[in-house]
Each structure stands twice: as structure tokens, then as C-alpha cells.
Amino acid sequence: MPGARDALCHQALQLLAELCARGALEHDSCQDFIYHLRDRARPRLRDPDISVSLLTLVVTACGLALFGVSLFVSWKLCWVPWRERGLFSGSKDNNQEPLNYTDTETNEQENSEDFLDPPTPCPDSSMKISHTSPDIPLSTQPGGQENCAHAVRVQRQVTEPTPSARHNSIRRQLNLSNPDFNIQQLQRQEQLTGIGRIKPELYKQRSLDNDDGRRSNSKACGKLNFILKYDCDLEQLIVKIHKAVNLPAKDFSGTSDPYVKIYLLPDRKTKHQTKVHRKTLNPVFDEVFLFPVHYNDLEARKLHFSVYDFDRFSRHDLIGQVVVDHFFDLADFPRECILWKDIEYVTNDNVDLGELMFSLCYLPTAGRLTITIIKARNLKAMDITGASDPYVKVSLMCDGRRLKKRKTSTKRNTLNPVYNEAIVFDVPPESIDQIHLSIAVMDYDRVGHNEVIGVCQVGNEAERLGRDHWSEMLSYPRKPIAHWHSLMEKR
């Protein structure tokens, strides 16, 4: 049956071909028939054949990859250790050869002389390329000089292997015992051995220098120019403040209103101050100040300059300070000497004036505010003797006006006084938010006027700890709240 069907199909195709050739059928139908015959004549791959061919390619690629990996692993595991073992055994055999230390020393001296001095004709003796290689005889034929020059160049390019500790000790003994020991040779050896070494001390020094440079730049607040001179007849230290340059800007306008306070420490009673120069970063003062002091006492005294920025509506800003001591080490002193000093950056907190401890207690029903001055510590010395006579003055302030003031007793000749004295103010509850306390530690002076050692404030208008202490007192009425307060300079 299939054979008869194929025969019928073949006859039908022939019949259609004859009809197309005679033109009995349409041209388009004949073209479609011809294209159909061509498509049937092309060999077609079945889907199972395509999948089998792709699977064969994938399996072949995986096999090649596994073969490459196995070759690489076998090379790493077998070939590299075998080669290193062969090299190590060869070098070990070479190191076991006997060394002629006398010849080595002689040849080393010849090499050093040849390296430092101009080239000389080649000797007839043998030349050593290294400590472990045998002697190579040199030919003495007519072209010997050219061969020698070439050999010398080759010798200089060869790196000498590192000698053992025993070799170094024996060679050192030979060098010391040799009467012709050359210092230049030893220096050259040290230079050659030092090439390529890392010296941590050089990097450490450089880093320290860089740190010092950054530190000095970060603390620089300009420079102060002044003149010092001592008048032996009047026994006075003459200080002339000439000018300041490159001061930092403290105002929003990009300028400052600078002035300078001067002390001859440890005496803070004698204080001088320059005029305020408005809106400038390079003020010219040209003011002279006198400090009566004995010449022999200058060694224990320090000249202290404090540069401030004047502010009409708030506390003055401390720009920086300059401290001059060891007057006898200054050039041309006691004659006139001109000095330029960097103004060191300090904050108000860095000015160590001491601390004061007191407690606050408020009774709302009675309208009574009690401040108990307990003690102070590490106060700044205001007298030449290195001590002070401190007492505490408390002022009740409202809108910048002083309503009342009280003070404690004076403690003589101490920097750590203990008071335990209570001061009471009558303040009604409706006015407690409008007032604040100003506390000043004073130094009593029997002859002159009393000096302020330092001040602090508590209240809603105070800063940081002063405001926190006041808020804590109001939060816990009828309970004494004690804190230490750092003293600040009075503005």
C-alpha cells in the first residue's frame, strides 16, 4: 500500500509539472508549486537529532575543561615542588664548597680599589666573581685589556650573595688584623648594605615634623610685635606694644575690635590695657606701659599678654595669649629688644582661674532664695607671695541692674578657702524667672582696690552649667542643690 501511494504521488507531480510547462495553469500557482518542491527536496533535521548534537557539544566542552584543570593541578602538585627541591639541593651543594678566606679578602680589597679608582690593567692572577664560584683564569693575549674591561663590567653587575654569620665574623677579624685596613672601604660597605633598607626613624621624624607643623598652624592666631627694655635706674620694665597682625575675625563683618591686657605674673593687681581699635585685623597700638620690678626678680616673673575682641552687647571674646618668661635669655636684654611672638589660641575655659562650689535652695511659699558658699579651690594667685586673700561677693541682678549684694568673710593667704556661709535674698515666686545671680570671687587688698579673680553666673540668662543649676533648683524646691562652677574672667 505505501508503494502504490508513492507511485500515485509521483504521477500527480509529473502531471502538474507538464501542465505548468504547457501554460495550462496560472503562473503564480506554478511558482508556488516549484518552491514547494524545493522545500521538500531539502534535507531536514528532526528535533531528536538537534538535541543529540547539542548534548554532544556540551559533553565535549566539559571534558576539555576537566582535562585542563587536571593538568594544572598535577603541574602544581608535582612539577613545582620537584623543581624547588632540585634548586635547593643544588644551592646546598654549592654552599658546602670550601672557601678560601684569605683569597676572598685580598680580592675584595682589589675590587673596592678598582671601584673607587680609575681602571688599571688587568692583573695576571685570577679574578673571583663571587664567594662561592671558583677562580676564573684570565687570558694574557694581545686583546687582554678589552677582555679585562668586559670582565670588570660583568663583575660589577653580578650581585654578591649574602655571606653567612661565620663568614662575616672571620672577615671582620681579618679586617681588624690587617695593617692596611681602609676606612673608606668600611664606609663603602655600610653604604652598599644600607641601600634598599627602610629606616623607620626617618619616617617617624618626618611625621612628627608634619604633626608639629599642623599643630602650630592650627593654634596660630596672628602675631604680636612688642619691645622690651629694663631701666636699671628706675628699676622698671618698659613694655611697648607696637602692633598685631593677621588676627582672626570675630565679628560677622569679617573684622574684630581688638585690645590687649598685660600682666606681670604672678602679680595680677597691676594690670594694663590698650585702647580698643575698631574693625581691624592688623591694629597698631604704639602704647608704652611700665612695671616696677627689681632686676633680680625678673627671673621668677612672666609677662602675660591677653588679646581680646571687644563686644559692646555681650562678653568679650578671648582671641589668644602670649607669655614671655626667662627675660635674661632674650637677646640684648636689658637693652631694647624687639620681639615677634605667635598669639596662641586659647578658649575662655582654658583660662584657669579656679573653681567655686555653692548650693542653691528656693522656698516658693516663703519667697526665699538661699545661696550657700561652700568653698573654692585652685584660685589664681594675685599677690607676689603666690597667694590671695579671697572673699565672695554675690549680686542679685534683674534686667542688668543690681538689686542687692552680699559678701562673705575674707580668708587670708590661701588659694583654697572654705566658707560654709549662707546668703539669703527675698524673691517672690512671680519674679523668680526675671532675676539671676552674679557671683564674683575677689582678692582683698588692704592698700589699693580689690581685684576680681573670677566670676560665674546662675539663672535663666546664664550659660551651660549656670542655667542647668538654676533649672535644677526650680525643679526640686526646698532642697539644696550643690555644684562646682569654673570661674571666668570678668569682661
From Swiss-Prot:
InterPro entries per record: C2_dom, C2_domain_sf, Synaptotagmin
Polar residues bias spans: 91-104, 127-144
Location relative to the cell: Cytoplasmic vesicle, Secretory vesicle, Synaptic vesicle membrane
SMART domains: C2
Quaternary organization: Homodimer; disulfide-linked via the cysteine motif. Can also form heterodimers with SYT3, SYT6, SYT7 and SYT10. Interacts with DNAJC5 and SNAP25, but not with HSC70. The interaction with DNAJC5 is stimulated tenfold in presence of calcium while the interaction with SNAP25 is inhibited.
TM regions (residue ranges): 53-73
Protein name (database record): Synaptotagmin-9
Region (Cysteine motif): 9-31
